[in-house]
Amino acid sequence: MSNSKLVKINGPLVGEIEVPGDKSMTHRAIMLGSLATGKSTIYKPLLGEDCLRTVEIFKLLGVQIEVNEDKIEIDSPGYKYFKTPHQVLYTGNSGTTTRLVAGLLCGLGIETVLSGDESIGKRPMDRIMKPLRYMNANITGINDNYTPLIIKPASISGITYEMEVASAQVKSAILFASLFANEPTKIKEFDTTRNHTETMFEHFNIPVAVNNDIIEMPSLGIEHIKPADFHVPGDISSAAYFIVAGLITPGSDITIHNVGINPTRSGIIDIVTQMEGNITLFNQTDNPEPTASIRVQYSPNMKPIHIDGDLVPRAIDEIPIVALLCTQANGTSIVKEAEELKVKETNRIDTTANMLNLLGFTLQPTNDGLIIHPSAFEQTATVNSFTDHRIGMMLAIASLLSNEALPIEQFDAVNVSFPGFLPKLKQLEKEG
């Protein structure tokens, strides 16, 4: 990733946009379309670096996949005819690819090695290895916690498992492995997490029963899978940057169309509503994932907020940009119970506080979150994404609060989830 980018966006931001397809759903659609025998088309997918890593892995397993500008076309021989790859399956910077594909590979009966970049090499994998081994998977890693992961054929058993962390990636690793289990599997959630794996299993004809915090899978659920086409909604995590930009920039009025508003992911909407920001949802649809158009307007008198409990996993990827939003509230905001942020691409608690404090804002990192005081952009300094796409985009939005350009090191990390992020912001600047 190259070094510094000088970022300057001029408000007000006015106009109507769409954001790239949802990253979580694109990953899962590629995986499920590849497992099914036949043709599946994914419309409006996210073509960021993470999702393209998932594409490359299934190509190496013998699936024909064609990536176009606005769709991914899959023609698969089916999971029974996957071939053994004769090279390491490289997941890049993608935690989703690493953890979900690991769960899937455990049941496939293929010997494989999964490895990612330096950042992935620091992220904990024991959280998936423990339940997968409980299912009789043969999976090992460095110090039983880090990539590369070595996966060997094993007969997968169904389990009853109580989640120890609120992590959709861990839950999904278990669910993908359970497709190959000889007995039913039951998972009890620790806290509600994004449910895209469950909704997309249903879309690809795999039976799954969800009752409050209990998820049940039948034995050998993989045998039910059928190919399917899927239209990917816009990613609410990407929309969040434009939502906050509109709320904090005088004179702004932004509408984002076709955004996924799955209730397990829509914490950002609840946060803005509680802060009394000017936000409206319309054009709502619900098949198979709920979507809406979201309009935001400049909101100078927002209230502070306490974020904890089940609101945290529902907004986990948005906490850095929410922290910036909270600096513009008229009182002190608190984020608690967000320890999960410590094991993302960076320690997002510390990185968010450190980078914003460099610019004159006032944030205090805590063991499990942040204390955010009303504060302003007071001085330009060279900041750094530390190769974390969400930190890079948050800092670009922070530049709206300054009259000067902001130098952001390692800014092209944003390409992981939002290629074309800056041009999209500039589009609203031009229309304004």
From Swiss-Prot:
What are its GO cellular component terms? cytoplasm
| Alphabetical UniProt keywords | Amino-acid biosynthesis, Aromatic amino acid biosynthesis, Cytoplasm, Transferase
Whether Amino-acid biosynthesis counts among this entry's keywords is yes
- Please provide, alphabetically and separated by semicolons, the GO molecular function terms listed in this UniProt record: 3-phosphoshikimate 1-carboxyvinyltransferase activity
* Active site: residue positions: D317
Q: Where are the transmembrane segments?
A: none
Q: What is the catalytic activity of this protein?
A: 3-phosphoshikimate + phosphoenolpyruvate = 5-O-(1-carboxyvinyl)-3-phosphoshikimate + phosphate
Q: Which SUPFAM superfamilies match?
A: EPT/RTPC-like
Binding partners and assembly: Monomer.
Q: Into which family does the record put it?
A: Belongs to the EPSP synthase family.
The name of this protein is: 3-phosphoshikimate 1-carboxyvinyltransferase
